[in-house]
């Protein structure tokens, strides 16, 4: 086998280094289990009832923490479906034509039947030069993964993965259960921390573990509470981290609340319709990740929606099994709770995204 070049060696080294934060969290979690379950509950606690209650509650939180963390790490980010990729002939035309009207016409023809409503800051179709595809709404190119990610929120080094449509719910639950895990440890460890601090308990091997465990749990509780609170706010507004920093641009212009459907509908966009799955790291988000219902406050173009009959979710996001195309819907200027989304055969058909498109240019977003 031919030796790999310097570029291949660097890529492999980077891939190894990217796992360091995950290994750190895993080692810290393993030590916290030993410190709490063994040194605190079994060695230091004298009351049997207290031991049983603390161990049962701790193992429940520990299991949910590990489950959600695992799902966040190993759920593959979803990429745009084939319909957003340019055909071989279209790619050849783009390579032959200069960056002029002929070049733009190729993109115009490719995008006219796609359910896309967001644009670049200049009003052009969002196109990725590296992936050679037209970006779906809320899709962005990750420079670390070097691919376009559906509804990308951010690339998280602590999970060594892109957080997007396929695993955003898992990421939220990971934050929630890790926060509860740290708060529970800090609360139940506090009295023993004070007793060791005031020399109320003899110096033993457990002293270091119990005291350091409290400091670590309290420190992580503070940082996790702010991060979890921020993402709860994002969910309530139906925004991603990228959209919070840069408002999405639609055909009519910038609209910071363009995807907000109201608190209840925003929650269901992420957690799904069946509340029994909300607290479990099981995929239940609405939609297919390629098109999203919008609430346009400045203009009233036709928008894709998810009617009741098509409200099925992609049960296996890793396999890219998307539900049927959403029907089009003419929405009012403000989407209210009194609106009902019903399937109407007279309204069905493809949304013609290219009817009022401005001149198209290329976008290279990393």
Curated annotation (Swiss-Prot):
Principal location listed in the UniProt entry: other
BP GO annotations: peptidyl-L-cysteine S-palmitoylation; positive regulation of AMPA glutamate receptor clustering; positive regulation of endosome to plasma membrane protein transport; positive regulation of long-term synaptic potentiation; protein localization to membrane raft; protein localization to plasma membrane; protein localization to postsynaptic membrane; protein targeting to membrane
EC identifiers of the protein: 2.3.1.225, 2.3.1.-
GO annotations of cellular component type: endoplasmic reticulum; endoplasmic reticulum membrane; glutamatergic synapse; Golgi apparatus; Golgi membrane; plasma membrane; postsynaptic density; postsynaptic recycling endosome
Mode of membrane association: Multi-pass membrane protein
PTM per Swiss-Prot/TrEMBL: Autopalmitoylated.
Enzyme class: transferase
GO terms of molecular function: palmitoyltransferase activity; protein homodimerization activity; protein-cysteine S-myristoyltransferase activity; protein-cysteine S-palmitoyltransferase activity; protein-cysteine S-stearoyltransferase activity
Stored Pfam families: DHHC
Positions of region (Mediates localization to plasma membrane and recycling endosomes): 298-366
Topological domain spans for side Cytoplasmic: 1-15, 69-169, 229-366
Family annotation (PROSITE patterns): DHHC
Active-site annotation: 156 (s-palmitoyl cysteine intermediate)
Residues in compartment: Lumenal: 37-47, 191-207
Keywords, ordered alphabetically: Acyltransferase, Cell membrane, Endoplasmic reticulum, Endosome, Golgi apparatus, Lipoprotein, Membrane, Palmitate, Synapse, Transferase, Transmembrane, Transmembrane helix
Region annotation Disordered: where it falls in the sequence: 297-366
Cellular compartments annotated: Postsynaptic density; Postsynaptic recycling endosome membrane; Cell membrane; Endoplasmic reticulum membrane
DHHC domain segment(s): 126-176
Transmembrane segments: 16-36, 48-68, 170-190, 208-228
Positions with biased composition (Polar residues): 297-316, 332-349
Database matches in PANTHER family: PALMITOYLTRANSFERASE ZDHHC16
Swiss-Prot/TrEMBL domain comment: The DHHC domain is required for palmitoyltransferase activity.
Family designation: Belongs to the DHHC palmitoyltransferase family.
Record's function text: Palmitoyltransferase that catalyzes the addition of palmitate onto various protein substrates and is involved in a variety of cellular processes. Has no stringent fatty acid selectivity and in addition to palmitate can also transfer onto target proteins myristate from tetradecanoyl-CoA and stearate from octadecanoyl-CoA.
Assembly behavior: Monomer. Homodimer. The monomeric form has a higher catalytic activity.
Protein name (database record): Palmitoyltransferase ZDHHC2
Species of the source: Rattus norvegicus
Gene designation per UniProt: Zdhhc2
């Amino acid at each position: 086998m031919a030796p790999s070049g310097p570029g291949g060696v660097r890529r492999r080294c980077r891939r190894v280094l990217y796992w360091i934060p995950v290994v750190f969290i895993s080692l810290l979690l393993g030590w916290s289990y030993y410190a709490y379950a063994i040194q605190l509950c079994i060695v230091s606690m004298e009351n049997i009832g207290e031991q049983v209650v603390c161990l049962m509650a701790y193992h429940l939180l520990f299991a949910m923490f590990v489950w959600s963390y695992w799902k966040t790490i190993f759920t593959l980010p979803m990429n745009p479906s084939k319909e957003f990729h340019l055909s071989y002939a279209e790619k050849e035309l783009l390579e032959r034509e200069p960056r002029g009207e002929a070049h733009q016409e190729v993109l115009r023809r490719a995008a006219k039947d796609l359910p896309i409503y967001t644009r670049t800051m200049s009003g052009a179709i969002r196109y990725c030069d590296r992936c050679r595809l037209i970006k779906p709404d809320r899709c962005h190119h990750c420079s670390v993964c070097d691919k376009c990610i559906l509804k990308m929120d951010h690339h998280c080094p602590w999970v060594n993965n892109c957080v997007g449509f396929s695993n955003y719910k898992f990421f939220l639950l990971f934050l929630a259960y890790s926060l509860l895990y740290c708060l529970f440890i800090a609360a139940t460890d506090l009295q023993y921390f004070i007793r060791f601090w005031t020399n109320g308990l003899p110096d033993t091997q457990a002293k270091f573990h119990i005291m350091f465990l409290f400091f670590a749990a309290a420190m992580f509780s503070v940082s996790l509470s702010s991060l979890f609170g921020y993402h709860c706010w994002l969910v309530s507004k139906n925004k991603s981290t990228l959209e919070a920093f840069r408002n999405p641009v639609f055909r009519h212009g910038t609209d910071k609340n363009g995807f907000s459907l109201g608190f209840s509908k925003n929650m269901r966009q992420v957690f799904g319709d069946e509340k029994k799955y909300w607290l479990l790291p099981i995929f239940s988000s609405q939609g297919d990740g390629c098109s999203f219902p919008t609430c346009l406050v400045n203009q009233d173009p036709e928008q894709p929606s998810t009617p009741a009959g098509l409200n099925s979710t992609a049960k296996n996001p890793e396999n890219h099994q998307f539900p049927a195309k959403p029907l089009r819907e003419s929405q009012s200027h403000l989407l209210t709770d009194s609106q009902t989304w019903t399937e109407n055969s007279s309204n069905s058909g493809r949304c013609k995204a290219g009817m009022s498109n401005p001149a198209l240019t290329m976008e290279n977003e990393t």
